Amino acid sequence: MPQANVNTTPTSHTLPFRAADFTTLTEALDYAAQGETGSNFYTGRGAIYASLSYAELRAQALDLAHKLLGLGLDKGDRVALVAETNPDFIRFFYACQYAGLIPVALPASVKVGAHCAYVAQLHLLLEA
């Protein structure tokens, strides 16, 4: 759903380019968070509905990482994530990385209007 007054993140920044010299994905995000760029999210009709700077992503992912570990998850545990192209997926994916958890991306439902039923089905499968 499009939101009014969503500003896109810039496409250029002043950070020096670093090619493949990061040892972890979180190290790369830590570096990118020093700049101004980020990710923009669009509807199927091309309207922006959310933006997330890498600095915001890093802060939110670190907060979520602490919350996930606070639920009793241990490093190395797997966390199922429905792989949708939205800010929550990216937040939780990076939260898992920071917490030492293994994000397991599950395919998103392709049926229009079937999201809730699909998530319920995944929940039953994961509990089995």
Language-model segments: residues:
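A short N-terminal helical cap/helix-turn-helix that marks the beginning
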Residues: 2-4, 18-41, 59
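Eukaryotic N-terminal low-complexity, Ser/Thr- and Lys/Arg-rich leader segments
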Residues: 2-13
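Acyl-group handling in specialized metabolite and lipid biosynthesis
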Residues: 13-21, 44-50
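Short amphipathic alpha-helical segments and helix-helix/interface helices
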Residues: 29, 93, 122-126
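Conserved long hydrophobic alpha-helices within structured protein cores
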Residues: 30-40, 91-107
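Glycine-rich phosphate/diphosphate-binding loops that line cofactor/substrate pockets in enzymes
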Residues: 33-34, 68-73, 123
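Conserved AMP-binding/adenylate-forming core of the ANL superfamily
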Residues: 40-94, 111-118
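Structural core segment of the AMP-binding/adenylate-forming
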Residues: 70, 98-128
